[in-house]
């Protein structure tokens, strides 16, 4: 994710991960991607006394009531293992409908970005890509749920699409287009 963010930001902006600054992440107890993005942005801004941009993103599957949603990483357990998370998605889909692989399962990948300076919210935006869940994981590119997400208008998963092509159509790119004017 950090590499993708670096690619999308202007080169004059320095990017640091929380671990590079030896900071633990805050508890993400918001109810939406936007809430969690703001929680992280405010938290890190207060820690380093600089404006901070934070991302919160995940997968929403309609038939699962928009789950995993804000819990997307947590579906992979404590280590956020997305192979586990993908297996859980398939398990949950099988519980809902044994025949789901023969249908189009509507889903979207969402990215919320926020910029905060201390307690002040400078900007908060959202980007999303609509699509469907692939009956089986495909591709080695990207990360997270990329191997099981097929964007509308494509026949391939994000995991099969080249990074350069994906960056031009994905949820994070759409969110960055909206937030660029605040950078």
Language model: regions and residue ranges:
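Anionic-ligand binding patches
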Residues: 1-183
């Amino acid at each position: 994710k950090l590499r993708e963010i670096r690619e999308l930001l202007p080169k004059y902006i320095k990017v640091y991960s929380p671990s590079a600054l030896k900071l633990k992440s805050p508890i993400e107890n918001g109810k939406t991607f936007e809430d969690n993005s703001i929680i992280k942005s405010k938290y890190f801004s207060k820690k380093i006394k600089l404006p901070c941009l934070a991302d919160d993103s995940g997968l929403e599957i309609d038939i699962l009531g928009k789950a995993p949603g804000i819990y997307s990483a947590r579906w992979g357990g404590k280590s956020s293992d997305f192979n586990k998370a993908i297996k859980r998605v398939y398990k949950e889909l099988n519980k809902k409908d044994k025949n789901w692989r023969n249908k189009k399962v509507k889903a979207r990948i969402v990215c919320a970005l926020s910029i905060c300076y201390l307690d002040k919210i400078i900007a908060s935006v959202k980007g999303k890509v609509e699509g469907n869940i692939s009956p089986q994981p495909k591709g080695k590119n990207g990360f997270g749920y990329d191997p099981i997400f097929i964007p509308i208008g494509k026949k391939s998963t994000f995991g099969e699409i080249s990074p350069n092509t994906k960056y031009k159509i994905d949820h994070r790119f759409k969110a960055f287009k909206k937030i660029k004017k605040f950078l």
